[in-house]
A protein has these predicted regions:
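Charged, amphipathic alpha-helical coiled-coil/dimerization segments
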Residues: 27, 77-136
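Short helix-capping/turn signature of helix-turn-helix
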Residues: 50-53, 114, 142
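N-terminal helix-turn-helix DNA-binding core of bacterial DNA-binding proteins
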Residues: 28-68
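N-terminal leader segment of winged-helix/HTH proteins
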Residues: 1-37, 84
Length: 146
């Protein structure tokens, strides 16, 4: 059987380290923009999920972020107070509140996104389409635990 060198412990540890550095660098690009609003990484994660999933409800957001309701409430209060997001009662179940980016939030998110986009865009542009597709496939398998 062929020896799979990329499955050895040292290779896996290196891959984990590279994932960390990629995450760190991608999100450090937006740190200055976030700090002007006194926001941190938790605010950005919430904004990102709300932007990508307009109308997401609180339970779904908690599940996707893997945080407690208590920790998310502080972040949401900050975002609502800053007019970044708005809560709208669900038409079918008024106990649920759906979250949307407000106009200010859309503008702010675009600024943050554009700071991160440069790094990702350059990496994708300087890779073959086959590499990008395979990398995306590997990331999805990491996320899904397969």
């Amino acid at each position: 059987m062929k020896d799979l060198l990329y499955l050895k412990d040292d290779q896996i540890k290196e891959f984990i380290q590279l994932l960390y550095y990629a995450y760190r660098e991608t999100f450090s690009d937006s740190k200055e923009v976030l700090s002007k609003k006194f926001f941190g990484p938790a605010h950005l994660r919430a904004l990102n999920l709300i932007e990508r999933n307009p109308g997401i409800n609180l339970g779904e957001l908690i599940y996707d972020l893997k945080v407690t309701k208590q920790s998310l409430n502080r972040v949401l209060r900050d975002l609502i107070k800053s007019k970044m997001i708005k809560q709208i009662k669900d038409e079918n179940d008024t106990r649920k509140k759906n979250l949307f980016l407000d106009r200010e939030g859309k503008t702010f998110f675009e600024i943050v996104y554009n700071t991160q986009k440069k790094r990702i865009f350059n990496a994708l542009k300087n890779s073959s389409s086959d590499s990008v597709i395979k990398f995306k496939d590997v990331l999805k398998k990491i996320i899904n635990g397969k």
